Amino acid sequence: MRYDPSLIEEKWQKFWKEEQTFRAEEDETKTKYYVLDMFPYPSGAGLHVGHLIGYTATDIVARYKRAKGFSVLHPMGWDSFGLPAEQYAIRTGTHPRETTEKNIANFKQQLTSMGFSYDESREFATSDPEYYKWTQKLFLILYEKGLAYMADMAVNYCPELGTVLSNEEVENGFSVEGGYPVERRMLRQWVLRITAFADQLLGGLDELDWPESVKQLQRNWIGKSVGASVHFETEHGVLEVFTTRPDTLIGVSFLVLAPEHPLVDLLTSDEQKTIVAQYVKETQSKSERDRISEMKTKSGVFTGAYAKHPVTQNPIPIWIADYVLMGYGSGAVMGVPAHDDRDLLFAQQFDLPIISVVSEDGVCINSCHEDFSLDGLSGEEAKQYVINFLEKNNLGSAKVAYKLRDWLFSRQRYWGEPIPVIHFEDGSCRPLKDDELPLLPPEIQDYRPEGVGQGPLAKVKEWVNVFDSETQKEGKRETHTMPQWAGSCWYYLRFCDAHNSCAPWAEEKEQYWMPVDLYIGGAEHAVLHLLYARFWHQVFYEAGIVSTPEPFKKLVNQGLVLSTSYRIPGKGYIAPEMAKEENGQWISPSGELLDVRQEKMSKSKLNGVDPKVLIDEFGADAVRMYAMFSGPLDKNKLWSNQGVAGCRRFLNRFYEMATSSRVKDEDIFEGMSLAHKLVQRVTDDIEKLSLNTITSSFMEFINEFVKLPVYPKNAVEMAVRALAPIAPHISEELWVLLGNASGIEKAGWPKALPEYLEGKIVTIVVQVNGKLRARLDISKDAIEEEVVALAKEAVSKYLEGGVVRKTIFVLNRLVNFVI
């Protein structure tokens, strides 16, 4: 029989859909397993090979766990709000909803063609009003707890896009989306008080089964620093400075303020006002990421003002520099160039004093003044001495600071969740009640923002201006919308109870499914999405509406998919099919020498691979197998279409083997042993997520198995069941062809038995007058008398009417009866 994936795959995809094979149930008699992909933004480009890696991995685990008897939740949805759809709407006039629905339909078809076992009954998009009704409700929980507030904030503002951008949406002073100039402005924004949960967010990391690199990124992002607040007296009052090194206090030779510091105008001398104002303006065009990047030179300007050193009373010059950020500590730092690399660069740039106060072995030196003395103390001893001194003299105190800033939550966009608040002229506001949700945006034709700091919603006066029946006052609806992060902060909870119209989730369903047992997605989400989701979850946990302190038990980041790119230096990339190899070098059609690299797949580099093309040529099962075989799940991997072809050839061989006339109802030990060993290896690989070695295990199995004169049917069935998680279509087909009922997962996961793994069973040949009459699987340790008795019983019909004149016995090999 010939293996034709185009017929097999469509057939079984239809079967799974009609039978609702993957519908999850809250079955209290079963152990639950919740496996989740980081759901995608439904872009127009659709599914790419990078998606395949993570999605195939979670699907293998989901299918395996179902076969093992778990109640499995494996859902998929759409992170569908966002800037790209809105920008497309501005360019074309197409409503973002229309674009999004079209893209989702395309994405769904592609996912179906890969045979992913999602519970389609739980599907939703974050832009569905039925979903964002609850996003709005959860925002109001944060508001009621004082965790959502409005404040004037220094933000990244893009005039061309007309909206505020996060630091991650800005690169080298330009927006990632569109490449437009970005500037710093003070705008009134909604902010979430994530800093109130800094300690919980830090502490919770220790209990998570996450990559250590991700946990460290979050620790660094939160940036807990233990130190001291030091008060430096100026002509205009006390200047508070935070330091993690109070032991170096005597080594201070200058102070540096962030350009946004509220005392800048007050402290700046008349002679320096023009140059300081110019510097502050220049800083506004830089993102915070640019400002704190490691550079060999530092910029800054002297204010003309001085502060008194709290110990020596010496005058300390006060400077302004963009490497100091207002959101960390107090927005002011003390410059100790002898013991801080950034301070050293700054001091060298502006010829400021460098005073060494700590020896190479960490002991304080040159740190005496009157009754103040640190000399000879270790770093920790000196820190405590200084803190005691500061507190005793009302010059400061011990302090803990965080790099983490409150989360800027406003966006001046149309395609996002409207913030459910009404504002009044007296400055007060009213959060909407549950029966007023969802707050829907109005239908509009022009998606461009309305002036600085105002989104497109501000244009629709009949929507903005309302008479509030609750307060009997005229009010205005909030015209800012939530960021794309809002919907993805809690979507994993909605999957527990996706279509509940009375609550975001039912308590008993959340308690059954949470936490997520396995969460797979890209490392680019290591901080923001994962940190924001943990923040919301911990708020909910503190409020008593979720049962677990953390949302994601185990996290795995899949590696990047690389592909060969071909570039004409100084010109650009060409398609791979246009490049040709000559004498070990790659040449363009016009004869130019090409720069050949392995780079991340992208449209711009022309090195992407369309999954549909691969599926049409090789079949989804072959693509799935190669997606895992290409390399360890968490490592970068080089894609090769030849590798997919190799997996297709393997599936051809496997299909031929399983449908061969050599498949017999005979449990030959060699065949059973190969099958049991295969099952054990595949089981171990899936449990350890070493999914790249599964394919090689199958290849080794079939190479040995086809050497057998007979293929034991039980062994073939075991191999087919073990193949099902990674190549489900061919496995379902073969399972039926072997005489079983449809639905291979119902057969359960095959169990590897020790006797077949440890070599304690051997297969012996039983002959009569030298002719093969039977095979027996017996214990390796069986004595001769026992083996002969079993052999005689197995060939009794051939011995009838004759007399056994001689019995030839070869240990663990054969018994031959001569009659």
Curated annotation (Swiss-Prot):
Its EC number is 6.1.1.4. A motif ('KMSKS' region) lies at residues 600-604. It catalyses: tRNA(Leu) + L-leucine + ATP = L-leucyl-tRNA(Leu) + AMP + diphosphate. GO terms for molecular function: aminoacyl-tRNA deacylase activity; ATP binding; leucine-tRNA ligase activity. It is an enzyme of class 6 (ligase). InterPro entries: aa-tRNA-synth_I_CS (IPR001412), Leu-tRNA-ligase (IPR002302), Leu_tRNA-synth_edit (IPR025709), M/V/L/I-tRNA-synth_anticd-bd (IPR013155), Methionyl/Leucyl_tRNA_Synth (IPR015413), Rossmann-like_a/b/a_fold (IPR014729), tRNAsynth_Ia_anticodon-bd (IPR009080), Val/Leu/Ile-tRNA-synth_edit (IPR009008). ATP binds at K603. It is found in: Cytoplasm. A motif ('HIGH' region) lies at residues 40-51. Its main location: cytoplasm. Pfam families: Anticodon_1 (PF08264), tRNA-synt_1_2 (PF13603), tRNA-synt_1g (PF09334). PANTHER family: LEUCINE--TRNA LIGASE, MITOCHONDRIAL (PTHR43740:SF2), LEUCYL-TRNA SYNTHETASE (PTHR43740). This is Leucine--tRNA ligase. The gene is leuS.
